[in-house]
């Protein structure tokens, strides 16, 4: 069985020596599951201890796997794809994302990450989702009668999930039988040339998944949250993995901060089977 000491040690070493140092993380998780059965093969959980003199500068220690450490808003592009599928809306249909800022009502303003550069304008729904346009995703939700409620639920930033649950949920989404397979198209396309995360893809291995950053930008959170979830090889997945790192709010923060460690684990797992 793959759930052995070598795999578990590899996960802990990746957390301790790489992920936590790279992001200045204070708590991190990794999970590896079998993509065909959803069986948990390995997990790791580390936390930096508080030091009375210098705050979060204590030693890194093994800790029990916490159940509520991250939100689930990483899945919004995939839920948007499912909304389009359920409403029989083509990925090729044009959607106007405007200049990158959408005033929905007095209490809801949606901004794309490139709003300062003028947004994406008119693009296909597929392009909007592959570029993680929040306006494009919102309009995908609105193709369903209950889209507004679904949007509010999907963008809930409450810390209610963890790396194991993210991996299992994504695995179910990716393998859900569908004639259109919009979720698969978006999950794989994000790491291809037309996708926003194509520069983060591992070499020689087709990856399906997504990175996400949730930053403290609204005075409601005191921490930044880096997450990844994905499966590989995308055409016939053997593994689904997820990583979560939490740190006190600070800048800079880039979506690729976990990519080196994700790709190391992906390549290590694939080479292990050769």
Enumerate the predicted regions with their spans:
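Second-shell loop/turn segments in exported
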Residues: 1-3, 18-20, 62-69, 109-116, ...
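Conserved catalytic neighborhood of penicillin-recognizing serine enzymes
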Residues: 36, 64, 89-150, 172
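Active-site beta-strand/loop architecture of penicillin-binding DD-peptidases
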Residues: 145-175, 184-273
């Amino acid at each position: 069985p793959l759930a052995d000491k070598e795999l578990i040690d590899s996960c802990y070493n990746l957390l301790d020596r790489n992920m936590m140092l790279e992001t200045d993380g204070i708590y991190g998780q990794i999970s590896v599951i079998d993509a065909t059965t959803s069986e948990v093969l390995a997990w790791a959980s580390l936390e930096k201890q508080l030091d009375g003199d210098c705050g979060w500068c204590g030693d890194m220690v093994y800790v029990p796997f916490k159940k509520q450490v991250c939100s689930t808003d990483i899945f919004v592009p995939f839920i948007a794809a499912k909304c389009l599928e359920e409403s029989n809306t083509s990925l090729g249909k044009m959607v106007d994302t405007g200049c990158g800022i959408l005033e929905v009502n007095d209490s809801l303003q949606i901004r794309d990450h490139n709003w300062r550069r003028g947004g994406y304008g008119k693009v296909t729904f597929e392009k909007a989702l592959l570029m993680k346009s929040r306006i494009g995703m919102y309009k995908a939700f609105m193709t369903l009668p209950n889209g507004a409620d679904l949007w509010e639920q999907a963008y809930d930033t409450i810390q209610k999930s963890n790396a194991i649950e993210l991996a299992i949920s994504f695995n179910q989404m990716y393998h859900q039988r569908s004639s259109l397979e919009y979720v698969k198209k978006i999950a794989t396309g994000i790491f291809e040339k037309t996708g926003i995360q194509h520069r983060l893809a591992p070499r020689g291995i087709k990856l399906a998944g997504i990175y996400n950053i949730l930053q403290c930008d609204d005075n409601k959170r005191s921490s930044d949250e880096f997450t990844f979830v994905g499966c590989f090889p995308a055409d016939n997945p053997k593994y689904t993995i997820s990583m979560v790192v939490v740190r006190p709010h600070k800048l800079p923060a880039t979506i690729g901060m976990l990519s080196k460690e994700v790709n190391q684990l992906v390549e290590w797992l694939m080479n292990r089977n050769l």
